[in-house]
């Protein structure tokens, strides 16, 4: 006889698989594979080597996803049979438990593959923070978010490198960019881009009044050297300045820091962590490429959302999450509507559930 806890676990796994089915439309994926296979059969397909490799990899990834999905369907069929047999044969209970463990592991693996299957999802991430208007209040909020993301990275055993750090006038930060290195760092963080809002009793207000602060987050993938993104040198304004801020003995105090402004978009990238001006410029150009890619990525997603009539709530330029610390505690994602009252845990880096909800939500728009 199957124990109650096992039955609950079976029901949960079935529910999880149904959720995955809603996101992973196998008919649509199989149709996409047919289109890619047809394209790969064209006589001129390999004329553009980079594009051909990208399409071949995409087709293979989709085929692997289909195989994994069908194997999971077979596993659930085996589970149903084992559960039925266990009603008359108690020795089959062990078989049910064994199949359950296999399914649990496969669902976790498939979910990760499905949700993190876009180009560059497996890349390292650059994460930039900028406070909104409001001086010290917003600058302090930006530093709280920086702490939240570094705590999250530590919990996931990711490496963290400070690329640029500009201290606030009284507290907090004027801006900061960090590099988070590890498996799927960009894929997990990419939907954290946007405006984050804080409501609290200000520690900087002698009258103890409630304040609202804003800070924006930008997340970009780190590209390898052969990714081609055209940048016209005439579109760049390059300034040098003296390094400073966090970093101690590892920050070069000469005029080696570099600030690059991309004139057509107004994007500004500052780097001060490398040992020479040449190295800082190279890193700044790499981050600029990543920001230009992310800008295009956001435009494409906004267009998909606009076609579904949802851009008002989910626009990249709008507020994405609110953190209320007074008069009650609540952190709420305004796109997925996922929320928790444990605001302190979130600010201590416990954001995995928010990230998973984001990935599931945006998977519908792939």
Swiss-Prot record:
GO MF, any single term: translation release factor activity, codon specific
Keyword Transferase: no
Localization annotation: Cytoplasm
Family: Belongs to the prokaryotic/mitochondrial release factor family.
PANTHER family given in the database record: CLASS I PEPTIDE CHAIN RELEASE FACTOR, PEPTIDE CHAIN RELEASE FACTOR 2
Function: Peptide chain release factor 2 directs the termination of translation in response to the peptide chain termination codons UGA and UAA.
UniProt-recorded name of the protein: Peptide chain release factor 2
